[in-house]
Each structure stands twice: as structure tokens, then as C-alpha cells.
């Protein structure tokens, strides 16, 4: 949570917090990556790897303006940079490659069957990126901007998730899923 600068690992069956990483600089998104946890840090403008076994921390990639959501993408990671309007691939060595640019405030990301889905926070557009082509597949109510530059770009992440054949869209202002 960016409010308390923690990333917590929780057992979903009973809600037990099994590990907590404290003192992070505005963590806004996290995902399991190999044997570690990848975290998008708005305050550091970076993606950090946390090792649950040892507690070690390592910056994997930096130089972002507003890293917003990090997910697994094939064997790598992708992160949305809301301010730059980019989706960036990060390999295991921290090398970055811009996959998509020219977006309007990319926030939530989801990946399935060689397609990457992107929620544009300012427009409400849900975009699909596949075979180097991008298309709008849906539009919902856009999100809101942060109240100050010290806060992450989106106070509430406009997120995406895929389960089975369905894409789930969390709408901040609509308060819907």
C-alpha cells in the first residue's frame, strides 16, 4: 500500500499476513516474479525485486516517471508508466524495452494468449495489444487524477484482471467491477 509503504504477502484462504516488507517508497503494484516479488515504486520511480526468503531488496529497473502497474509478461515483466504514456518490458537483467508508446495514462495491465490489455485512466479506454497492433475493445468511465504530485498518478488504480475467458475491469469512479 502506498499509504503505509508496505508490501504484504497474505494467505488468501485465511487472511494471515505471512510476510511484510516495510519502508518502501510508495509501492503501487506488486506481482510474484520467479522466486521474488516485483514492486512498482512510485516514490523511487523504479521497479524493485524483494526476496521473501532473505529480505534482500534490489532495484531491477529505474528511470520511470510514474510506474503504475507491474505484471508478468511471458518470462519478463511489463510496467505501465502513466506519465510517459508507455508500457515497458523489463527482462530478468533489468533491460528495458518500450513495447507501446503514445498511450494516454496507461494504468491497469493484464496478459493472456499473447495479448496485452491496457486500461487508459484518463480516457477509460480498454486497449488490446496483439501482433504489434493496438485496438480499443471497450470504454468505461475514466479515472481521476492524483490530488498532488506527491501521490501516485491515480489515487485508485483502474485495474484489469483475467480469469478464464473474462477480462475484469475495476472502475474507480463507477465503483464497479
Question: What is the meaning of each model-derived region?
Answer:
Residues 1-177:
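Sequence-structural signature of mature extracellular/luminal beta-sheet repeat domains
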Amino acid at each position: 500500500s502506498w499509504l503505509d509503504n508496505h508490501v504484504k504477502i497474505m494467505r488468501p484462504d485465511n487472511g494471515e499476513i505471512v510476510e511484510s516488507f516495510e519502508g518502501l517508497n510508495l509501492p503501487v503494484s506488486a506481482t510474484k516474479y520467479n522466486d521474488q516479488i516485483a514492486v512498482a515504486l512510485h516514490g523511487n520511480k523504479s521497479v524493485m525485486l524483494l526476496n521473501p526468503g532473505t529480505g534482500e531488496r534490489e532495484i531491477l529497473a529505474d528511470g520511470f516517471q510514474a510506474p503504475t502497474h507491474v505484471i508478468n509478461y511471458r518470462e519478463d515483466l511489463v510496467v505501465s508508466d502513466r506519465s510517459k504514456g508507455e508500457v515497458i518490458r523489463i527482462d530478468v537483467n533489468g533491460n528495458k524495452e518500450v513495447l507501446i508508446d503514445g498511450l494516454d495514462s496507461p494504468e491497469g495491465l493484464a496478459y493472456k494468449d499473447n495479448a496485452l490489455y491496457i486500461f487508459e485512466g484518463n480516457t477509460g479506454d480498454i486497449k488490446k495489444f496483439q501482433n504489434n497492433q493496438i485496438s480499443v475493445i471497450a470504454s468505461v468511465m475514466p479515472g481521476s487524477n492524483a490530488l498532488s504530485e506527491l501521490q501516485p498518478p491515480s489515487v485508485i488504480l483502474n485495474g484489469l484482471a483475467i480469469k478464464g475467458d473474462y477480462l475484469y475491469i475495476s472502475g474507480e469512479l463507477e465503483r464497479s467491477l
